[in-house]
Amino acid sequence: MEGSDFLLAGVLFLFAAVAAVPLASRLGIGAVLGYLLAGIAIGPWGLGFISDVDEILHFSELGVVFLMFIIGLELNPSKLWQLRRSIFGVGAAQVLLSAALLAGLLMLTDFAWQAAVVGGIGLAMSSTAMALQLMREKGMNRSESGQLGFSVLLFQDLAVIPALALVPLLAGSADEHFDWMKIGMKVLAFVGMLIGGRYLLRPVFRFIAASGVREVFTAATLLLVLGSALFMDALGLSMALGTFIAGVLLAESEYRHELETAIDPFKGLLLGLFFISVGMSLNLGVLYTHLLWVVISVVVLVAVKILVLYLLARLYGVRSSERMQFAGVLSQGGEFAFVLFSTASSQRLFQGDQMALLLVTVTVTLSMMTTPLLMKLVDKWLSRQFNGPEEEDEKPWVNDDKPQVIVVGFGRFGQVIGRLLMANKMRITVLERDISAVNLMRKYGYKVYYGDATQVDLLRSAGAEAAESIVITCNEPEDTMKLVEICQQHFPHLHILARARGRVEAHELLQAGVTQFSRETFSSALELGRKTLVTLGMHPHQAQRAQLHFRRLDMRMLRELIPMHADTVQISRAREARRELEEIFQREMQQERRQLDGWDEFE
């Protein structure tokens, strides 16, 4: 592509994403499917704006690369070791069983056995990008099914290496392609990367961080990710696996969160580009001429993978309510199939079967498009199962009256609130997206609804029209603000109370008219500060008064700075306000010191 062509392609990608994704979200089909449809629209079989799909698809794999780096940052080596059973047990079983079944079905359609084996392995793989994105959207990261799904995806990435090595063997050209000296050098280079990364990365980032220039730190992070990907690609290995290893090596470093912050914006954009590129690669000509064959193929592929995954989840001991989530999210074909089929085609494994190869490729792409829809069906099934009428023995002491309070989110923050309310005999209903948490809470008598709390129908089913208050404890600030807007629009009678992760979220809540909120660490930090004052010799009564004064004045400053909380030009005004409030605090505390102590020295 010429430079101007790349610029035009970039503009088209951005326009397609901006137009299609909000529309898809509004229709309730999800952002991933929106990206895929946008790709179909601008690709060679749609409006034809872009024709060089293969080059863009290869570039867009960087989205998966960045995603795997961030996942690596979240997994330290000890955590990875804990997952070894699920990675090499369930992961290996899924690939082998799915590949065997699918290869057998391909042989029934007159594929040569060598081509059928390659086809079965390629189809057994799932889309890392799509599965991880959907798991995050569905809140599966913390659940047992999400952990198991990640283990299977990681094994599939590891299986890329032997799968590619198998192709020349099946093509009968092993002697030409297997230079054992080269293979040995690649293994040594890979080991060298592991050792070098283990002992060099932290000192290098410590040196860069010492410069104090944030842009250089971001550039170094990009260099690490892209360099790892390029190095692994040169070795003929998975780029995503290389960046995942780099992430794991830095997972226990002090720079973990800064690295994640630097990479996150690039990850989102490039993942979107990847899904658009997959949509562009869909050959609608083959779909039109072989519609029935393609539809049957997609159904068979998805059904076989769901069957294998469901049975493995059952054998592994996954709860019945989570098995369909696990099976559904990994039911599609993956991007690795395109790479494997291309390699096999260059080795003439599919000679005489080019149309069949095209049909299989179209099947993989369409199977990706079915996954978001399939997960919506799974969500509806889970909603009916968990949000329908409950049996009496499932809820020992929760009565059938309408709730007084709805608690959204039941993580560590929400659990404390829920327990306090339940201890005081308040009628509460909990909305939670983590199905394993739903199962656990029902055992303890909580009235729980599974699903996304930003859905008006779910709020209505949970009793929002009759409840007095709603307590929002979402992890993501965006979800909190969206839920506040929905409640103000559809349930204006509700008293809204919310969790704020910090001052920025507190400002946003105040601007939205929510005055009852709690900053996540503010109260506990104040309490620890009070105890610190006591250990430094301040009388407990004065320390308590100092804590109360500080809380009141900090809240006053928070309200005064609302109009300028996002205005960098007026940061100096914020500093002046802080100094003024500190002076007021000092004067009031001097007045306090003149007063007699109000109670004894013991807490």
Curated annotation (Swiss-Prot):
Keywords: Antiport, Cell inner membrane, Cell membrane, Ion transport, Membrane, Potassium, Potassium transport, Transmembrane, Transmembrane helix, Transport
Major location (coarse): membrane
Domain of life: Bacteria
Keyword Transferase: no
HAMAP family: K_H_efflux_KefB
Function: Pore-forming subunit of a potassium efflux system that confers protection against electrophiles. Catalyzes K(+)/H(+) antiport.
Oligomer and partners: Interacts with the regulatory subunit KefG.
Name of protein: Glutathione-regulated potassium-efflux system protein KefB
Upper lineage: Bacteria, Pseudomonadati, Pseudomonadota, Gammaproteobacteria, Enterobacterales
Gene expressing this chain: kefB
